[in-house]
Amino acid sequence: MKKTICFILATILCFCFASCGQKAEPAQVSLSTVMQEIRSSVSLPEMMDLTAENLQDYFGIEAGEITDFAACINANGYQKEEIVLLRASDAASAESLVQKLNLSLENAAAEMQNYLPEQYALVKQSAVRTDGLTVSLCISENAQQIEAILDKYFK
């Protein structure tokens, strides 16, 4: 009887120690890998990749705010199509990125409202998305397909 009780207690103790172990962090996929899947899976117009310098010019995003990024915009000037994937360096930077992308979205809506009403509608239905430290903006006619790919990686 004593051996059985000792065995049960030892087993419970082992489970307690095992559950206290450090949990493995999920592997962070490169945002360029996510962008490659988006571009290969979704029908997009001719897109131009953005550099870190372009991020500063287009969105006011400083290099120190992000640890990884992938971004592209429509190569022509009359059709609004943007996919921006950013990984913030910390929570404060993530909040700053959300604000900057929201400002960009508001500016795009104001710009398109009088010139291209159909593009205005596309911009108005777009939103900035956050998944932990990953912040994204998707302005696209195929936004649902792109969001499904993002869900696969970040949900």
What are these regions (language model features)?
Residues 1-4:
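Positively charged n-region of N-terminal signal peptides that target proteins for export
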Residues 7-13:
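Sec-dependent N-terminal signal peptides
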Residues 15-19:
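C-terminal motif of bacterial Sec signal peptides marking the signal peptidase cleavage site
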Residues 21-23:
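Bacterial signal peptide processing site
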Residues 48-79, 92, 96:
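Short, compositionally biased low-complexity segments enriched in polar/charged residues
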Residues 75, 118-155:
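A short, solvent-exposed beta-edge/loop patch
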Residues 80-90:
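A short acidic-to-branched-hydrophobic micro-motif
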Residues 91-130:
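Short Gly/Thr-rich strand-loop-strand
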